[in-house]
Regions:
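N-terminal, leucine/charged-rich tether regions that mediate assembly and partner docking
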Residues: 1-134
Length: 134
């Protein structure tokens, strides 16, 4: 299965539910992400099902992460971009315009070495602002 292009999943700053994604977290997640350390998977709505045939199975894997400066509401902000290896089911969901947004799962200090990207959910109601529709 071909990997996706890089797309934006988080931007430093506030979220719709009152949390803050820090610039430091964005930098650390991009720098530290390594599938050999912990392979982050793509799930639906932050639910990890136990049945691989059920609705809440995994929909792919994050293969790489990087940062880029973006302009958001006239301000330069640091953003996290990821590349994924999607399953055929995720591609079909996206074609049907379902679960077109993403929501990052962040551990703020994994193994006491800084923030780490633990997963990515596909959703229709993301908390973080400024993501790409993917």
């Amino acid at each position: 299965m071909p990997k996706s292009k890089f797309f934006r999943v988080a931007v430093e700053g506030g979220t719709t539910d009152g949390r803050t994604i820090t610039r430091e977290w964005i930098e650390q997640m991009a720098k530290r992400y390594n599938q050999s350390t912990y392979g982050a998977r793509v799930n639906m709505e932050h639910i990890r099902g136990i049945d691989p045939e059920g609705l809440f199975k995994m929909y792919g894997d994050i293969t790489a992460a990087k940062t880029e400066e973006v302009d958001m509401e006239g301000e330069k902000r640091l953003a996290l971009f990821v590349q994924i290896d999607p399953t055929p089911e995720l591609i079909e969901l996206n074609k049907a315009r379902q679960k077109v947004y993403t929501s990052v799962e962040i551990h703020p200090n994994l193994n006491e070495k800084g923030a780490y990207l633990m997963g990515l959910a596909v959703t229709d109601s993301p908390a973080s602002l400024g993501r790409s529709e993917e």
